[in-house]
Amino acid sequence: MQKKPRLKLPHTLVLIYLLVIAVYALSLVIPSGQYQRAEKTFQGQTRLVTIPGTYGAIEKKLLGPQWLLIAPIRGFQDGALIIFLIFIFGGVFSILGKTGAIESGIQRLAVFFSRNPRSKKFVIPILMVVFSMAGGVYGMAEESIPFVLIFIPLALSLGYDSVVGVAIPFLGSAVGFSAAFFNPFTVGIAQGLSDIPLYSGLAYRLILWVVATIIAIVFVMLYANKIAKDPKQSPVYEIDRSRGYAVPVETAKDVAWGTAQKLVLLILFLGIGLLIYGILAEGWYMEEIAALFLGIGLVSGIIARIPPSEMATHFVAGAKDVMNVTLIIAGGRAILIILKEAVVLDTVLRFTAGLISAVPSLITAHMMFLTQGVINFFIHSGTAQAALTMPIMAPLSDLVGITRQTTVLAFQLCEVINPILPTSAVTMGVLGVAKIPWEKWAKWFVPLMVVLIIFSLIALIPPILTNWGPL
């Protein structure tokens, strides 16, 4: 009996453009309207925030069909920084691959773990705690992209797959970001806009961060152990076979490596140290990070004595490998551009606020969580989402009988869905440099996402029952 062919999802770029078409169609029927906005300075930065109670309908703004083509172009403009950052990462790591330094370093690590097999089991939990702390303290997001390119070969050398290599830095920081206790871009901004003490409620948030981090670590470790026993169970088995730098621990041999390779690795690690310092102490963002890695690539190529033309060839080849993801990022941005140009984003916000006010107070926070999750599909910046929604949600929470602290928690926890969003520049940037198809990653991540959503909904119950306020 012939098996029925499995349903195959269309290319991710096709899925994104179908979403663009769907949102455009909705923009034709959703009434146009907007809230008034005012400038508010917080933590040294001035932002436009919505003013509650000021929503007003305006004359319907109909976008012509040409916006189906204009919006993705605007998406490139809107996402130019992160798109350029991803091009830089692709090109620089192609040069680093040519030097052979990363492959040699992984070989040495594999030898270490072959001689110390007990230490292998500590790699995932220790590193994920570090990245979760980074997400919880300073809101690590885009900064996780270069680490993916380092941890994939490490994971392969340990007998795992590239999904584990992505999960260590990306899921680690993403879980920390959503269950953050000190993240200035979500907790800090949202509390400031809600007029509650900055970083209040720290103790309960710290408990949630610990539990969420443990959930993610256990999930990744169980999966990693399964792959170690049978690599063919990996959804990216064929993709990983084409990667040239995997050295299984069991077959690792202590090989000699040259001075140039040692120097290149030294430059890379010094660069990562400078990256961490720049982010924490100097407030570096994508421009500075891109410049740093461009410098790392150029210096590494010179040390390895790669001719300039050959270096340029490898850079272009690496940048070409991530072209697909830059197109997807532009498409994801196009969705928000259509909502803004049609002036319907505030209408959607007002409608969702109405839904929240209509449900019983016991599940109001859960409704806020789900609502923020929907908005998060279109707006991925925690700061931008806070500026849009918290001035509306905070006074709404007073009316429905829950505390503003609980409302802030519902807002931040909705970030647990970020790692699956095809409209997220960070998610698609990570998958692009990792060369993992979105559909394979999504299928793998869904079980963990469901667990994290259930955890988030449960986590909102004690604040509701105890009338959790600033502590």
What is the role of each PLM region?
Residues 2-13, 38-42, 46-47, 203-314, ...:
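Long, contiguous bundles of hydrophobic transmembrane helices that form the permeation core
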Residues 4-20, 156-168, 261-264, 316-325, ...:
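Alpha-helical transmembrane segments and their helix-start/interface "positive-inside/aromatic belt" motifs
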Residues 12-21, 48-104, 112, 284-347:
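Core transmembrane alpha-helical segments of multi-pass membrane transporters/permeases
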Residues 13-29, 86-94, 130-134, 176, ...:
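Hydrophobic core segments of alpha-helical transmembrane domains in multi-pass membrane transport
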Residues 87, 116-150, 329-339, 355-395, ...:
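Hydrophobic alpha-helical transmembrane segments of multi-pass integral membrane proteins
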Residues 116-125, 160-168, 200-204, 362, ...:
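Membrane-interface alpha-helices at helix entry/exit sites of multi-pass transporters
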Residues 131-148, 156-205, 216-221, 373-388, ...:
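Alpha-helical transmembrane segments and, especially, the helix-loop junctions at the ends
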Residues 318-322, 430-451:
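Interfacial loop-to-transmembrane junctions
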